[in-house]
């Protein structure tokens, strides 16, 4: 049987046509596909040309394109190329993975503009995508301002997010939300946009929800809420070019010992101060090639969004839900100099400051619940003490804050109405577990302070923080100095607890481990900072500071005012929390612990500051009194129990 060449060619044609439906391209990641195919059109890009994925974009895009990560949130600033990343990944889904996709924007107008200026030029400039769009540039039922239907059978929808009807009927594999923070919280009383939109992917074999936005006001921001519901919040860590320590870039402020720093009124002098070893880093020195995203909650990390590792370095499955944060400091599209210039323009203008926080830092704007005291004003509130222990002080307590390389202690004096005086500041440097360091802490605990009549006062009760170190170190010191004199403490995990909740019985380690309501204590202390005594008149609750730079200076004032109350989304719920913004706050913590020591004395041993002061003043005028201050201290420290 003879077969002509034309018959062979026809047979070949039909075989190829029959097998075409079985053809699948070689698998590619989203980044691989984008680097090979994606093109930035002139209509919507600062610079037209081929796409090249930047180091900080790599993991985000691959996570967006991964079949194993169902939910991706991106909390971002401006100038990081988010919309371009999103569009590149959508093109990847349509052409390479052949998925049905849908994206919502805040309004119908936003959606129409996005389709005209971003989507249509992208289809035109990517040959493999244009080959699937024979209708391009023509009036056709598969080519509308809300939908594009490609010849591979896949559809792309671009809709506004205000109307509930736009969240119905569509069945897709990928649901995306651009500028989620600008969406209504409740879509026509039917629910949140992500709740409604994610219903559209429930029937997909590979469901994907991508949410991204510049954030807005904390506590009401949709992208913040979405991020709070994700178990993983990833920040981009880069190695210091000098010491090699990893850190994510932070803007910082004048009180933080890290972040962007510059000479006043000279933005061109800007550099980054390493938070680990105070190395001076210039923008051009940073190498992001091997940088990685690390979760600030769980420690898991990834460099490329494909391979994921536990905090110990073991490879793990990709997470089901993940949030990335990225901001302008990483972007090659701007400079640190420009960031500083933008910051300087916000001085004295709350509106501009809010815009800077949202669009440059990529952070939510915090509606302050309580006003943070001015450290510089507080630093001027210095008084001359008549003696190391002022006359109206009846009782001394102390708080000890534990750090790996030091212990910090503050001694506070208390008078009637809980009027307070800062008496001493002790910073004991050295390894926290070194016996020589602890012996110097012992000396600080046993130090005495002189009243105007020459009488010596000892510290009656000390609360010592167990957090961050081996708590048995503090337990042993409690046993050494007296179980009721040195009390180990830990912070309460629940908001609104009493300042101190001392147990009636010892724990299994033989000490009275006491829970401290740090939030409650800080609220009370900050309220007291607003009280201003007139002259030397007593004022219940007033706080006094000595005119002694060894004890009180601007640094001490900054630490006492380091924290502020803000609203945050935690596990999908809005909570009011204290936040130090990474500022040093040891002085405030020590004040909290000293106040807790006072409250323990009042609740457990019925300390009466007014009665005690009256007795001490009698002692000042009557040397024949048989009871000494040491006797009072022993009684009130519980040694007579």
Spell out what each predicted region is.
Residues 1-7, 94, 477-481, 593, ...:
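Interface-prone segments of viral and bacterial extracellular assemblies
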Residues 114-118, 122, 265, 269-278, ...:
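Mg2+-dependent endonuclease catalytic cores in nucleic-acid-processing enzymes, primarily RNase H-like
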Residues 130, 371, 601-608:
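Short, flexible/disordered secondary-structure transition segments
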Residues 73-79, 604-619:
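Short alpha-helical "patches" and their helix-cap loops
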Residues 1-396, 400, 407, 439-460:
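Phosphate/NTP-binding elements of NTP-utilizing enzymes
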